[in-house]
Amino acid sequence: SLHDALPIYRRSMRKFTDEELTQDEVVTLMKAALMSPSSKRSNSWQFVVIDDKEMLKELSHCKEQASSFIADAALAIVVMADPLASDVWIEDAAIASIMIQLQAEDLGLGSCWVQVRERFTATGMPSDEFVHGILDIPLQLQVLSVIAVGHKGMERKPFNEEHLQWEKIHINKFGGK
């Protein structure tokens, strides 16, 4: 089944069609985010869901490079969390981000993670600060990522299992075979 193969088929998609997402698709994506595990069930994450084309275009400038495709996505999900609610907010937000991506793949949609934390715009402004400014995000929340989602605009081959680096797997101790 596709569920068994999600990690094989989930590939970063930076090219999208013009087709919008259905409300059911958006709700399913957000359910996956809200069901994602978090440390001590702190649920320190929050999400801003953007489908407005002008806002997507503006958000596409959140980094100096590797974010322009956000403008062509049907949806962008900004993943943020409250460091005061969890000392492992980065991990919690990262898990939520990948849950959104895996759910997108399961729906037959494409997605791509845009890293915001510790990145900068073309003018040198911290990407986190840029995103805070355009989306009116409260200061206590830190933005980790933007997940761009849409209908796939190109085909990508599944991950080639022949390239798996099995030497990075250690049994019982480092170096164990």
Which residue ranges define each predicted feature?
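Acidic, surface-exposed loops and disordered segments
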Residues: S1-K177
